Amino acid sequence: GPVVLRRFLRGGWAAVFSRESYLYTGVSASRSFREYHLLAELHAAGLPVPRPVAALCRHRGILSTGALMTMRITAAKPLADLLTGDDPDAHVWAVVGRTIRRFHDAGVWHADLNVRNILMGAGSQVFLIDFDRARYRPGTRVNGEGNLNRLKRSLRKHWPAKEKSAMPVAWAALMAGYDE
């Protein structure tokens, strides 16, 4: 089936020096291999994540670059694409909340939960992507407050200005799903 290839790129101040390179600390410690193994664990646990296919870590001297290949989630769109209209679908937003809660209950802390890292698939399926720097502690429920605050900031940033009044309605439905 179709796949997605994602290169690991730096952001923030570190990107000034190098957009692609990281300090090489070994293949198993590389960001691409850590995310590959985490996705494999989450997929095996039945959580809605893309199935990992391959990881790449190339190094020269003390620097490395990396990439991750996953199966494409067909017919999926980022949650950001749903931020239109002034009447949000409460059912969809509740499913998003329930899905995030599943991850937290399973012990997953997502380092960058935002409207681009939540995919809406066919039949109200919700998937999370981009688990770079995420943490997984099976059997330990995660306090999701930080993740939810990050998502709320992302919603405020990406929601169209002329329809901002719909955001609290969507957020309330998301939290109702999360709290079920």
Predicted features and spans:
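AlphaC helix of the protein kinase catalytic domain
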Residues: 78-87
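Short acidic-glycine loop/turn motifs at beta-strand connectors
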Residues: 1, 121-123
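Conserved hydrophobic "DFG−1" position in protein kinase catalytic cores
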Residues: 72, 120-121
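Conserved short alpha-helix within the protein kinase catalytic core
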Residues: 90-97
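C-lobe/activation-segment region of protein kinase-like
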Residues: 127-180
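Hydrophobic residue at the +6 position relative to the catalytic HRD Asp in the kinase catalytic loop
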Residues: 113-120
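Conserved catalytic-loop position in the HRD/HxD motif
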Residues: 107, 112, 130
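Conserved ATP-binding subdomain of kinase catalytic cores across diverse folds
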Residues: 1-77, 98-106
